[in-house]
C-alpha cells in the first residue's frame, strides 16, 4: 500500500489483544501452592511494568501515565497510557499508584493504551495449573502494535497463544477519500519472525472485509521436564509419565481449540 497523504490526524484505532498461557503439572497441594506463588512473583506488577515499558519503546510510543497493582491472593495488572507524539515532561504523571479495578478498566479505553492482567489458576483435583496473561495494545495514529508481537510472546514464555488484531474507524486523505485500514495485512503471522513460526503450530481465522484477524498458536516441542514443578520426569514410572503427558496434552488442546474434549 502506497504512503497516504492524510487530511489531519490518522484516526484509525489498531488493537492487538492476546492471551498467553503457561501450563504446569504438580503432584501435591504443596507443589500447587508453590507454583502459583512462584509464577505470581515472576510476573508481578514491577516486572510487567518493565515489559510494557519496553513494549512502548519498541512501537515508538511515549508514556503518559503508568498505573499498576499486585492483587491478593494472586494476580497483577498494569495499564500504561501512551501517545504518538512527544509530550511535555511537565504534563506526565510519573508517580506510582494502584491500577484499576476490573470494572474500572473501561475508563482507560478512550486513549491509546497498553494493559496486562494476570490470572494464575489450578484444577481442583488433576494437578494441572495454568497461568494466563491477558494483554491489550491499542493505538491511534500511525503506531502499530504489531511491532511488539515477537517481544511479548518471548518475554512471557508462552505454551499457547491466542491473538486478535482489529483496525477500527477510518481516516481521510487530502482529497477526502476514506481509508478503513492504512497497511497491508492478510495474516498476523506475517508480523512474526521465522524462528517464532518454527516454534509453533498455528491456525488463522480471519474476517478480511471487517479488518479482523485471529491467530492461534500451540508450541510444537513437548518436553515433559518443561511442564513439571519440583519433580523430575526420570523420578516417575513410565506409566506415570504417560498419564501426566496425556493430561497435559488434553489440557493444552482444549485451551488451543477453545472447547472441552471428551475423555476417550
From Swiss-Prot:
Q: Where is the active site?
A: 112 (schiff-base intermediate with substrate), 117 (proton acceptor), 140 (proton donor)
What Pfam families does UniProt report for this protein, alphabetically? AdoMet_dc
Q: Which gene encodes it?
A: speD
InterPro entries documented for this protein: AdoMetDC_fam_prok, S-AdoMet_deCO2ase_bac, S-AdoMet_deCO2ase_core
- EC number, UniProt record: 4.1.1.50
Keywords on this record?
Autocatalytic cleavage, Decarboxylase, Lyase, Polyamine biosynthesis, Pyruvate, S-adenosyl-L-methionine, Schiff base, Spermidine biosynthesis, Zymogen
Which of the seven top EC classes does this enzyme belong to?
Answer: lyase
The chain's disulfide connectivity reads: none
What is catalysed by this protein?
Answer: S-adenosyl-L-methionine + H(+) = S-adenosyl 3-(methylsulfanyl)propylamine + CO2
Q: What is this protein called?
A: S-adenosylmethionine decarboxylase proenzyme
GO cellular component terms given for this protein? cytosol
Signal peptide limits:
none
A Gene Ontology molecular function term for this protein is: adenosylmethionine decarboxylase activity
Query: Is S-adenosyl-L-methionine there in the keyword field?
Result: yes
